[in-house]
UniProtKB/Swiss-Prot annotation:
Keywords: Cell projection, Cilium biogenesis/degradation, Cytoplasm, Cytoplasmic vesicle, Cytoskeleton, Hydrogen ion transport, Ion transport, Membrane, Transport. It is found in: Membrane; Cytoplasmic vesicle, Clathrin-coated vesicle membrane; Cytoplasm, Cytoskeleton, Microtubule organizing center, Centrosome; Cell projection, Cilium. Belongs to the V-ATPase D subunit family. It comes from Bos taurus (Bovine). This is V-type proton ATPase subunit D. One of its GO terms (molecular function) is proton-transporting ATPase activity, rotational mechanism. The gene is ATP6V1D. Subunit of the V1 complex of vacuolar(H+)-ATPase (V-ATPase), a multisubunit enzyme composed of a peripheral complex (V1) that hydrolyzes ATP and a membrane integral complex (V0) that translocates protons. V-ATPase is responsible for acidifying and maintaining the pH of intracellular compartments and in some cell types, is targeted to the plasma membrane, where it is responsible for acidifying the extracellular environment. May play a role in cilium biogenesis through regulation of the transport and the localization of proteins to the cilium.
Amino acid sequence: MSGKDRIEIFPSRMAQTIMKARLKGAQTGRNLLKKKSDALTLRFRQILKKIIETKMLMGEVMREAAFSLAEAKFTAGDFSTTVIQNVNKAQVKIRAKKDNVAGVTLPVFEHYHEGTDSYELTGLARGGEQLAKLKRNYAKAVELLVELASLQTSFVTLDEAIKITNRRVNRIEHVIIPRIERTLAYIITELDEREREEFYRLKKIQEKKKILKEKSDKDLEQRRAAGEVIEPANLLAEEKDEDLLFE
């Protein structure tokens, strides 16, 4: 096993404990990232469905708005000059908010009206009904355009976030966790080998001690047989003392 396949670490009980903790942490991180990816994917699909529905509705609204414009011009004449002269500042404005989905910040756009309607009196002479319908249709078109822009921005943001999250999951699952597992297996193998070597060494020591003891006992027996060894007195043995007579 090469050094690239595992983490360089000295095999010990402490290293084994550390690797087990790292493995558990990596597995927990992978599971959390998978849950995050699932949550992002769910929201991604919801937004995709909403984009399709909004685009279909957008086509209908824009067709209706274009038809209303033609109808208003036919009824009220060319009112573009009047509109341009009355423009001071934008009445419809956009503001951005933030939405959070599993730690990913999504921009949310919404439109609002500021000030009074500068074209409220436009069309009093003729074509008032057609102009009011025209304003409603284009207001609806602006609302849908803002919603569509918000959805598409969130769509792109979520798509990138899902790709990054899935890459992290794959790296943890296919690179980090296997590397830790190989390191842990290496540590366990080395520790088992050390235990076997220690057991063999202790067994050899015991065998050597046994041989030395047997040899020592044999030499002692031979010396006893030759009378070279005097048995030491047993102080604990019971001996009868002679009576002492006192005159």
